[in-house]
C-alpha cells in the first residue's frame, strides 16, 4: 500500500525510541559484532556466509543458545553464570538431526567439548554439571524449538514460521541454511527460473517473514571457491549460487579462516589469544559500520565465541567507544534463586 505523510509525523517517536533503546536487539555472541550490528534486532534478516567446516551451524546454534537460555557454566570460574536472554527461539535444521543439535546445546551450556556427549565416560563432577544443564533445559523447554526440514520449500517455511510464532510467541528464528534442493526446484516446476532467481525469492521470503511477524531471522549460505583465497574484505561476490541473496538482508557477513600472514600479524602485537576466524562485515543497513573485519576465537567444540579485534581492510586496528547496552526485562524473575536451585542439584 502506498502511503504519503509529513516528514514530521512520528518524529517524536524516533527520539523516544532512542532514549529507550528500543531499536537495539538482544545480544548474540561477540561483543564487537553486537556493537557493529546493534544486536539481533526484530524485523531484520541476518545473513552469515562461510565455507564448509568453518562452523556456520555451530555459530548459529551458539547464538540461539545465548538467546534462549539465561545461564551457562563458566569452566574457568567453575560456576554457573547468568549470561543470556531467556527468549524464545526456533532452529530449523535442513541437514542436522535433532540429536546433533541437542549435543551442541549441551556442549554450549556445560562448556564440555561436544565429543564428550558422543563417547561418554563422564567424571563425577561432569555428571553433576550435566544434570544441572538438563534441569536448565527442562526449566526453559519452551524457549528452544528444533524443526527438522530436510526438503525445504518456500511455502513450507513460511507456513511453519507463521504457525510457530503464533503458537509459541517465538521472536528469533534460525534457518540453516539457504541452498538449492530438489524439493525447492520442484516448487517451481514448469516455471523458467534460474537457480540464482530461486535463491533470491527464498531470501526475500525470509525477509518478508521478519517484517510481517516482527521477528529476527538468521540464515546462512555457502561461499564460492574464491572466498578462502580472498585477503580483502569479502562481499556478496563470494556467495555461492546467487550474489543477489544479500539484496533483502539487513546484515551481511562472511566468515573464513585467517591466513598464516594474518596470524603472524596478531602474534607480532602480543595478543595472548590468536583469532581462528575472521568475519568480514560488508553490509549493515541502518548502521555506521561496514567494510570492517572482526577477528575472533571460536571453540567449535563448545560453540562459544569471543571477539578479539576490529580492523579495516588494511589490517589497521580500529579502537572505538562501546555504545551497545541491552537491558533485559526479566519480568520480576529472581534469577538468583534460580541459580541457587541449579547449584543445589548434585
Which sequence ranges carry the predicted segments?
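Pre-Walker A (Motif I) flank of P-loop NTPase domains
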Residues: 41-46, 87
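C-terminal regions of RecA-like/P-loop NTPase motor modules
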Residues: 3-10, 81-84, 111-119, 145, ...
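Core recognition of P-loop NTPase motor domains used across DNA-transaction enzymes
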Residues: 1-43, 51, 76, 80, ...
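Cytosolic-facing regulatory segments adjacent to core modules
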Residues: 13, 31-35, 70-169, 289, ...
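Walker A/P-loop NTP-binding motif
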Residues: 62-72
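Hydrophobic positions on the alpha1 helix immediately C-terminal to the Walker A/P-loop
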Residues: 59, 63, 101
Amino acid at each position: 500500500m502506498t502511503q504519503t505523510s509529513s516528514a514530521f509525523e512520528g518524529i517524536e517517536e524516533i527520539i523516544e525510541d532512542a532514549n529507550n533503546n528500543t531499536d537495539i536487539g538482544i545480544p548474540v555472541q561477540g561483543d564487537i559484532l553486537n556493537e557493529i550490528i546493534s544486536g539481533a534486532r526484530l524485523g531484520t534478516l541476518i545473513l552469515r556466509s562461510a565455507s564448509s567446516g568453518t562452523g556456520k551451524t555451530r555459530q548459529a546454534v551458539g547464538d540461539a543458545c545465548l538467546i534462549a537460555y539465561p545461564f551457562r557454566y563458566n569452566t574457568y570460574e567453575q560456576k554457573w553464570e547468568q549470561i543470556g536472554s531467556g527468549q524464545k527461539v526456533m532452529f530449523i535444521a535442513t541437514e542436522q538431526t535433532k540429536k546433533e543439535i541437542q549435543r551442541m546445546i549441551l556442549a554450549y551450556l556445560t562448556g564440555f567439548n561436544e565429543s564428550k556427549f558422543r563417547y561418554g565416560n563422564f567424571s563425577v563432577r561432569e555428571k553433576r554439571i550435566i544434570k544441572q544443564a538438563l534441569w536448565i533445559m527442562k526449566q526453559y523447554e519452551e524457549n528452544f524449538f528444533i524443526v527438522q526440514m530436510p526438503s525445504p520449500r518456500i511455502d513450507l517455511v513460511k507456513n511453519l514460521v507463521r504457525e510457530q510464532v503464533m503458537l509459541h510467541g517465538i521472536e528469533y528464528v534460525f534457518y540453516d541454511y539457504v541452498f538449492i534442493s530438489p524439493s525447492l526446484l520442484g516448487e517451481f516446476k514448469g516455471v523458467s527460473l534460474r537457480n540464482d532467481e530461486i535463491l533470491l525469492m527464498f531470501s526475500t521470503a525470509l525477509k518478508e517473514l521478519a517484517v510481517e511477524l516482527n521477528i529476527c531471522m538468521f540464515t546462512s549460505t555457502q561461499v564460492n571457491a574464491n572466498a578462502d583465497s580472498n585477503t580483502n574484505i569479502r562481499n556478496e561476490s563470494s556467495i555461492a549460487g546467487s550474489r543477489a541473496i544479500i539484496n533483502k538482508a539487513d546484515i551481511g557477513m562472511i566468515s573464513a579462516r585467517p591466513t598464516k600472514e594474518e596470524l603472524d600479524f596478531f602474534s607480532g602485537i602480543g595478543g595472548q589469544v590468536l583469532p581462528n576466524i575472521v568475519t568480514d562485515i560488508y553490509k549493515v543497513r541502518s548502521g555506521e559500520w561496514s567494510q570492517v573485519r572482526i577477528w575472533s576465537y571460536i571453540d567449535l567444540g563448545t560453540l562459544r565465541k569471543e571477539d578479539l579485534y576490529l580492523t579495516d581492510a588494511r589490517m589497521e586496528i580500529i579502537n572505538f567507544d562501546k555504545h551497545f547496552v541491552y537491558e533485559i526485562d526479566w519480568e520480576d524473575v529472581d534469577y538468583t534463586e534460580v541459580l541457587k536451585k541449579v547449584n543445589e542439584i548434585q
